[in-house]
Amino acid sequence: PSPRWASVPSGFHLLEIVGYPAPDMPTGAALESRPFMVGGYRWSIQVYPNGRFPEDADCIAVSFALIQDVEHPVKVHAGFSFIDEVEKQDPRHVRTIQITHVPGNCCMGFPRYITREAFEKSEHLKNDCFTIRCDLIIVQEGLQGVNARANAD
């Protein structure tokens, strides 16, 4: 039989940081994106230049948040990457979260996305600016066993 394709709610958002603030921000302080919609849900991205938790203060942390109340947790696959230029991803720092259930008003991510030292020496930081991309794919229960093609917004 021929493969069946289903549309999967998906999209991405870019958070551009202008003026790298690491020395001036305490651990646990975040830079947050404006809200954006993927799959009919409201999301945001957070970047913690000096880590989210004291034990990770030497790292940059990234997370995404479902910023609305929901009746049931949303099943989602998420990925983060640095964007050196719009539409050009660097695969060396791509991190993904496998399918997970996200309750409303909750965030998930990577407390140790990259060490601050490695980041500050990388090509991702240019003129004290960088961009993080967050890709979200909403997993719908009825698509099990069907080849699904993600349609980026």
Task: Please provide the spans of the model-predicted regions.
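Protein/peptide-recognition domains central to ubiquitin and immune signaling
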Residues: 1-153
